């Protein structure tokens, strides 16, 4: 197997099944750690990561619970519980579909938009604090790369691959 590797390639191992020198494994683990780092500032403003994700999604336009569940990769009961909590806090409002009275959509309230802006600011500041521990040019590159990864996620979702 080692004979078929190109110069600089590493053979897959149980610790690194990709044989890429560990970059993909390191990236996967960094993504898991990043989720924790996002939770820190969100908890300080009384939002959970799933709530933040819902508010961010609704900022792109209203949505029915089934659409939200699919886009956020959670079960319908989970999205119902999330929405009930956000409704109780007046961060979202529920509207009946004028064409189908059985269908409802959810939209951000003014308070929801304010909460999302606070969350965006808090998470952004946390990313800057973490990024300050690398060279300034690298920090800017990390932030830009993370934003690009968000674009890739949206494209994969639109293609039905995520």
Task: Locate predicted features.
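N-terminal leader segment of winged-helix/HTH proteins
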Residues: 1-46, 137, 153, 162
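Short amphipathic alpha-helical segments with heptad-repeat character
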Residues: 21-28, 32, 73, 113, ...
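Generic structural concept
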Residues: 28, 59-62, 109, 143-150
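N-terminal helix-turn-helix DNA-binding core of bacterial DNA-binding proteins
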Residues: 36-78, 160-162
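Helical hydrophobic small-molecule/effector-binding pocket
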Residues: 37, 113-114, 118-121, 152-156
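DNA-binding alpha-helical recognition surfaces that contact promoter or target DNA
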Residues: 56, 81, 144
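Charged, amphipathic alpha-helical coiled-coil/dimerization segments
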Residues: 84-147
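Exposed, interaction-prone assembly regions rather than primary DNA-binding/catalytic cores
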Residues: 138-162
